[in-house]
Amino acid sequence: MKPFYIIYICLLFVGVSCTDVIEVDVPEAPPRLTIEASLDWEQGTSGSDQTILLSTSTPYFAEQKIAPVLGASVRVTNEDSGAEFIFEDQNNGEYTTSNFIPVIGDTYALEVIYNDERYTATETLVPVSDIVDVFQSTEGGEDKDALEVNVTFDDPADIENYYFLRFKSDGDLFPELYYIKDEFIDGNEFTIYYEKIEDEDDAIKEFQPGETVDIAFYGISKQYHDYLRLLVDQYENSGSPFSPTPVPLVGNCVNIDNPNTIAYGYFR
């Protein structure tokens, strides 16, 4: 997306008012394939039901913000066992399977064929630590009078771990994302808090009694941790006049047939 500026110039003349309308063509990038492929294994389930989302990027001012991809071929292969899992086209941008077999520590390869071009990516299924406690308090946040949600987990010792924590409360348009590296918490119990600071300009309100918060906690690879860090940093700094111009983030999905045709999104 190219940045643009709207500049208003008022010229005052005695007895004269003149308005010039200038139309400027904003260059548009070609549509790119966007791959949202998160193979998540929720504790207490078999992990057999998985969904991969495919869409194409759209111009910033387009009326249709999401353009689902139909007719693609999607396959995931366990590179350790050779097992293949075909994801069926649901004709709405979703590709699903109900027979996926997750194996912690195994490496999986994604293959997407779209417009006669092949996109591939590989990722290892990473374990996640157990959540020890979830509680509310008013002690750990910035505002000592505001409610916050706390999540405590144990980090295994002498193992390099990376985590992804997602909070989404009632009425939130977007979730709050946290990426965590265990460099300074290795082998220890760690608590992270989620607090909503009231902001009238952004229509953000503090947590209210009875409000529900959805919490998801993932183990992730170092590569995905680094991708998330860039993604979150760009989002949080996008409103600052001193922040660098955002650039499209390219994940781990590579076009084998035409490397110059990049894909957005990530396979994990």
Predicted regions and their residues:
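A sequence/structural signal for flexible, mid-protein segments enriched
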Residues: 19-268
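C-terminal motif of bacterial Sec signal peptides marking the signal peptidase cleavage site
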Residues: 14-17
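Positively charged n-region of N-terminal signal peptides that target proteins for export
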Residues: 1-5
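Sec-dependent N-terminal signal peptides
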Residues: 6-10
